[in-house]
């Protein structure tokens, strides 16, 4: 286990879902047109969504497949803010939580 991950505060499932929904609201408020073209705006949103999820040691594809997919897409948009399809898929997945 990554020592950095093990020392990061762990959320409950409910807290993780609330975290995702909060950032989905922020994404929608900012708009995908802005987030796919303005690196500064995008990094502020995507990093704050993705990083805490990445640090959750309990999120895995077997026990929490939907939340795991949200994590994958959160990291995807954090790495490539111009990928509009991934932003859209991220929002779609969060809506299913």
Task: Briefly describe each language-model feature range.
Residues 3-6, 11, 22, 44, ...:
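A composition/secondary-structure signal for short, hydrophobic, low-basic-content segments
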Residues 1-2, 11, 66, 86, ...:
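Short, low-complexity interaction segments enriched in Ser/Thr/Pro/Gly
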Residues 17, 24, 50, 70, ...:
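Small-residue hotspots
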Residues 3-6, 15, 61, 70, ...:
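N-terminal cationic leader/targeting segments used for protein routing and processing
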